[in-house]
């Protein structure tokens, strides 16, 4: 019944639409924060190598390649709690070039920025800002202690004030309870987000969560259906950890998924754009950018 009603809700608001987005690992490693799931934290001994911010030309070429493949959104993602003003200027220049020359829509996940930063980025072509809440308010302190959920929610509020769409979601399998999953869905509804990425933890060696068991497929299905009921007008985006559920990911369309991060993730492998397009078409889906439902 949960599956059937979730499918009906998705069809009612989104028909058979499926949206594809991709991410660019704009700056990697040596993050000052201690999120227990993340291999980029300087607190943990992982194999991630630090990198400097990519150039405007590098960002543009990535966006251009994905635009040609039929991807609808391109997000620049950077490690660290925030970027320098010079780094933000480089990213703004990239957004300006991408938005003026390509069809692909610009997104960003650049940390805890301030209002003036968001205004500047929006004027440069940024459409949507991403900042994951990760988990419930109650469980958040078990995952990260170097910043708070309130800081994340304040950042989201500033991005909305600047006129940006919001993308915010969670990670399943970090040790949270079913109640925590309900709470994070309710928290996201309160924030009125436009898109919710649902990640499945991919335990990475060297992080505190390296020995966490993989989430059972039935838990993933039930959680997605739950989110669809709580967030009927929000795009539910299958995100990190996709290879863990590769064998049954198209089944998740029936539970409420109507978007996917395609290609490689930040520090783990993903599925190719061609794979995702083929899967969507074989399931009678229509590949298209989905605009926010107000």
Where are these regions (language model features)?
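Conserved, mostly hydrophobic/aromatic
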Residues: 6, 35, 76, 131, ...
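Anion (oxyanion) recognition and catalysis
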Residues: 99-100, 160, 281
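Core AdoMet radical
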Residues: 42-60, 66-156, 165-169, 194-199, ...
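A general structural detector for well-ordered alpha-helical segments in enzyme core domains, enriched
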Residues: 59-62, 90-98, 117, 151-158, ...
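N-terminal pre-triad scaffold of radical SAM enzymes
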Residues: 3-44, 51-68, 72-75
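Catalytic cores of alpha/beta
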Residues: 113-123, 174-189, 243-255
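Conserved strand-turn element in the central/C-terminal portion of the radical SAM core barrel
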Residues: 80-84, 155-179, 198-213, 234-244
């Amino acid at each position: 019944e949960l599956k059937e009603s979730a499918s009906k809700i998705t069809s009612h608001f989104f028909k058979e639409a499926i949206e594809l987005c991709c991410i660019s690992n704009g700056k990697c490693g040596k993050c000052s924060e201690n999120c227990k799931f993340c291999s980029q934290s300087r607190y943990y001994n992982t194999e991630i190598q630090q990198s400097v911010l990519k150039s405007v030309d590098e960002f543009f070429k990535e966006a251009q390649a994905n635009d040609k493949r039929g991807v609808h959104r391109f997000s620049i993602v950077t490690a660290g709690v925030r970027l320098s003003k010079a780094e933000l200027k480089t990213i703004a220049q990239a957004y300006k070039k991408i938005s003026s020359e390509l069809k692909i829509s610009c997104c960003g996940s650049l940390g805890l920025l301030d209002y003036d930063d968001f205004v500047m980025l929006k004027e440069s072509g940024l459409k949507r800002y991403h900042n994951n809440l990760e988990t419930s308010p109650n469980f958040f302190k078990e995952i990260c202690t170097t910043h708070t959920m309130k800081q994340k929610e304040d950042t989201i509020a500033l991005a909305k004030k600047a006129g940006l769409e919001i993308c915010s979601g969670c990670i399943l399998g970090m040790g949270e309870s079913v109640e925590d999953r309900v709470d994070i869905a309710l928290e996201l509804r309160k924030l009125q987000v436009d898109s919710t990425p649902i990640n499945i933890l991919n335990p990475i060696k060297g992080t505190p969560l390296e020995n966490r068991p993989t989430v059972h497929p039935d838990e993933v299905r039930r959680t997605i259906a739950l989110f669809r009921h709580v967030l009927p007008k929000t795009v539910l985006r299958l995100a990190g950890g996709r290879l863990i559920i590769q064998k049954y990911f198209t089944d998740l369309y029936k539970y409420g998924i109507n978007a996917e991060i395609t290609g490689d993730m930040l520090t783990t492998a993903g599925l190719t754009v061609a794979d995702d397009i083929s899967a969507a078409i074989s399931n009678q889906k229509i590949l298209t950018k989905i605009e926010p439902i107000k």
